[in-house]
Each structure stands twice: as structure tokens, then as C-alpha cells.
């Protein structure tokens, strides 16, 4: 299983083996959602000579925001698809089979991957709760404590 945590500034790719994270092969990429927003605005400036408010970009990420002019919305959608392809390529580069490996996207970017990543196969799940990371570490901590108590006990 592979957990892909897409946060504000980073994307963490963490394999889970026997219900435990394998930190020896965990990879962090500096390609979080904020970098995606920055890239969208670079393209808007390049093509239209003006930026889009971060709030408007986030609204497109979350629900499509049909109230933006088409020329801006088209750039945003194109860049979101490119961003998702970049994340998918990270996973492939690490040697994971996108059709077979159970992949769980978590964090704020899980919604972006679900809406724009075009990955709807059965082995892919999306946990869109922005507190999922903290809840996951809490869960893993409890498993670790239970195992430690059993060994010592």
C-alpha cells in the first residue's frame, strides 16, 4: 500500500508494509498544493497578463467555480490536470504499478487528485479529511504502543 499525503508545500509518498510505514523508502517532494497554485498564476500572467486570487483557484479545486471567465478557468483546469499527472509520475517513478498497488491519497490535495487526476480504479482511495494525517499518526501510534506492550508484557 502507498499513502500519498498532498499538503500545502510537500507531497509525501509513504509505503505501508504490515500496517507500518516504511520510512526507509519514504519520499518527500516539494510539490504541494501551494506550488500548484503558484504555477497556475504563472500561466495566467504569461497568457493573460494577470493573476487569479488564490481563493478563486481553491474554489475551482473544490467545486468547479463556474463564475470565473472561461479563459481563466481553462488555464486553471489545464494546470490542475498537469499537476495531477506530475503526482502520478512521481508514483510511477518509484516503481509502483498504478493499476495494482493500493494507493490512498490524503490531505488537502486528495480532493484535487480525485477531481482532476482521472484515477478511478478500485485500488485508489481518497481521504479528503484535511485532518487525516494527524488521525493516521494517532492510529499508527496506538498500533505501535499495542505491539510494544505485547512484547514487554
Give residue spans per PLM region:
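Helical "lid/coupling" subdomains associated with nucleotide-phosphate turnover
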Residues: 1, 33-153
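Conserved acidic E/D residue at the C-terminus of a beta-strand in Rossmann-like folds
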Residues: 5, 27, 128
